[in-house]
């Protein structure tokens, strides 16, 4: 990617991030240059900014998880419009925790758990729970292997779905930065 190919709205966001990081006006140019270099090298803007809005919460995102997609917000909408007050919710393949955290936000009386095969993703999901002051249990599990509790009213699984042979067709910012284990299905 060339700097000329970075959209104007992304440049504006990078400038804001540089202002946030710079301790003084003399450090601003260095920070901005560093952020531009990262973006030119195809690092996702969401990773550079570190936090993204997701539905009604804020999420920290980095290389430990897949960046939540608009389709995930659509899934939240479907659940919100069609499910009435589940008691126990399980999110399988939780990643950043976005689905589990939104379930707790939408259904505050529900017991919500999120599991993921990645220890790093679980760590990030716990950070996001703390960031949003939401009481959700997260633990490591390959699918349902370590899930001892039964009787969930709602089980959500937004699992990897891209066939191995199609991975090379993904954009560089996806294939070079996001965890392949969250994509390869």
Question: What are the residue ranges of the model-derived segments?
Answer:
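Non-catalytic nucleic-acid substrate-recognition regions in nucleic-acid-modifying enzymes
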Residues: 1-11
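Short, solvent-exposed loop/helix junctions and linker helices
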Residues: 4, 66-69, 89
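A general structural signal for well-ordered alpha-helical segments in protein cores
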Residues: 11, 32, 42-45, 96, ...
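Conserved AdoMet
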Residues: 13-80
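Phosphate/oxyanion-binding loops and surfaces in catalytic or ligand/nucleic-acid-binding neighborhoods
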Residues: 21, 38-42, 132, 162, ...
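Conserved beta-strand segments that form the floor/walls of ligand-binding pockets within enzyme
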Residues: 60, 102, 116, 175, ...
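Conserved SAM/SAH cofactor-binding pocket of Class I
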Residues: 74-169
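Mobile active-site "lid"/loop adjacent to the S-adenosyl-L-methionine
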Residues: 159-185
């Amino acid at each position: 990617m060339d700097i000329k190919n970075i959209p104007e709205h992304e440049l504006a966001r990078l400038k804001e991030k540089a202002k946030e990081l710079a301790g003084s006006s003399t450090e601003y140019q260095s920070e901005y240059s560093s952020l531009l270099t990262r973006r030119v090298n195809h690092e996702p803007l969401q990773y550079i900014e570190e936090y993204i809005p997701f539905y009604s919460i804020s999420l920290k995102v980095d290389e430990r998880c897949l960046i939540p997609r608009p389709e995930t917000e659509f899934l939240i909408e479907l659940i919100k419009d069609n499910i009435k007050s589940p008691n126990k919710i399980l999110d399988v393949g939780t990643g950043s925790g976005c689905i589990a955290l939104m379930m707790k936000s939408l259904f505050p009386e529900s017991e919500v758990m999120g599991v993921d095969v990645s220890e790093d993703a679980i760590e990030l999901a716990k950070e996001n729970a703390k960031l949003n002051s939401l009481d959700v249990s997260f633990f490591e599990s390959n699918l349902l292997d370590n899930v001892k509790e039964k009787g969930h009213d709602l089980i959500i699984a937004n699992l990897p779905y891209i066939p191995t042979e199609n991975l090379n067709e993904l954009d560089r910012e996806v294939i070079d930065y996001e965890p392949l284990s969250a994509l390869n299905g």
